[in-house]
Amino acid sequence: MTGRLALLLGASLVASSLFWVQRCAAAESGGGPIVRIAELEIDPGQLEAYKLALKEEIETSIRVEPGVLTLYAVSVKEHPEQIRLFETYRDASAYESHLQSPHFKTYKDRTRQMVKLLRLVETEPILLGSKSR
């Protein structure tokens, strides 16, 4: 191995180590990303109204809240009334801010009678990756 290659390899190892130390420290301090999964069952007779309210809430949250990183809504195949939300927040503070936002409170009030079942799943992020569109 040449000296130059060894130096490059060493620098890469140091940079990788620093990256992982920072990631671990952020996770331990609670400063890492928060990922939530919500499982909902919507009253089939109100499904279209629910989708409209959800669309408005997601679009507003993404536009005005810098700590809201992703909000994805999907339905279970062949069961459109079963909705799954995948939410990623910059950190716990961003999640709490989202819960207190006027648009989220409006969404909750507006959809309260539409939601038959809500189950929140706490997660522990392992690896989060995405690609720019």
Question: What is each residue range found by the language model?
Answer:
Residues R4-L9, S16-I34, Y72-E81, K108-R133:
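Glycine-rich beta-strand-turn "strand-cap" elements at beta-sheet edges
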Residues I34-K51:
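Mature N-terminal segment immediately following signal peptide/propeptide cleavage
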Residues E39-E41, V74, F86-T88:
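Short hydrophobic/aromatic beta-strand micro-patches
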Residues D43-Q46, H79, D91:
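Acidic/polar helix N-cap motif
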Residues Q46-V68, H103-T106:
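Short amphipathic alpha-helical segments
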Residues E48, L52, R90-Q100:
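Short amphipathic alpha-helices within nucleic acid-binding modules
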Residues L54, H98-L99, K108-T111:
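Short, flexible helix/strand-to-coil boundary loops that buttress conserved ligand/catalytic motifs
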Residues E59-R84:
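Short, glycine- and small/hydrophobic-rich beta-strand elements in well-ordered beta-sheets
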